[in-house]
Amino acid sequence: AALCSREDVTADIPLLRVPDTLKAAQTLAAAYRRRFSLPVIGVTGSAGKTTTVAMTCAALGSMRPLRTADADNGQIGMTFTLFNLDASYGCAVLEMGMSLPGELARLSEMGRPVIAVINGIGTAHIEFFGTREKIRDAKLEILSGMPEDGILIFNGDDPLLWDLKGALPRKTLFYAQHNPAADFLAACESTDGVSVLQFTKP
């Protein structure tokens, strides 16, 4: 079967005619996601999302995580990633991108993350927002689909995120390389061409 928004289209398969195929697909994806109780981690930020997803999946390898394809993080890509869920996965790590206000809220409400990572606020798509503060506010839409006991993980070296310490209605943890007040300090060491990233709690 297929979703179709045009009356003049015919096919040899059943067609479900809807006003907006993307909205219909997202409604179906959200309903399908609700069939699974597995934990979901949502990852957003202005840069480094795909790397963060890859590293998170490597750390959670024993749980066989479902992940979004590299940088396929938009309204269509993440929607169809959710349709790949099945009982063989122990968790999901979803990259959530956005370029306009409201987009991240829709992704979060579909994916329903229990943990959300924001790895930084840059200037990507600033032409649609005007300021980095407004980009940050749009990134915070990731809270839209989270439960009340969800956990936020923020880059504590980013002043725009650090300013939110104690201000959000979720447990919030900060990691950093240079901010000694963060909850976890990151250090990367390279030996013989092998890099090791470690997090320590001060």
Pin down the residues of each PLM region.
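Acidic, Mg2+-coordinating active-site environments of NTP-dependent enzymes
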Residues: A1, S5-D12, V117-P202
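Short, basic phosphate-binding NTP loop
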Residues: A1-G42, T51-A58, F83
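General beta-strand structural signal in soluble alpha/beta enzymes
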Residues: L3-C4, R17-V18, L66-D70, L94, ...
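Conserved beta-strand scaffold positions in the cores of enzyme catalytic domains, especially
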Residues: L15-R17, V40, P65-R67, T172-F174
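Short, acidic/turn-prone active-site loops that include or flank metal/cofactor-
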Residues: D20-K23, L28, A71-N73, G120-T123, ...
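A general structural signal for well-ordered alpha-helical segments in protein cores
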Residues: A25-A29, V53, Q75-M78, L104, ...
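ATP-dependent carboxylate-amine ligase catalytic core
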Residues: A31, R35-F36, A59-E141, E148
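Residue-level detector of alpha-helix initiation sites
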Residues: A47-T51, M98
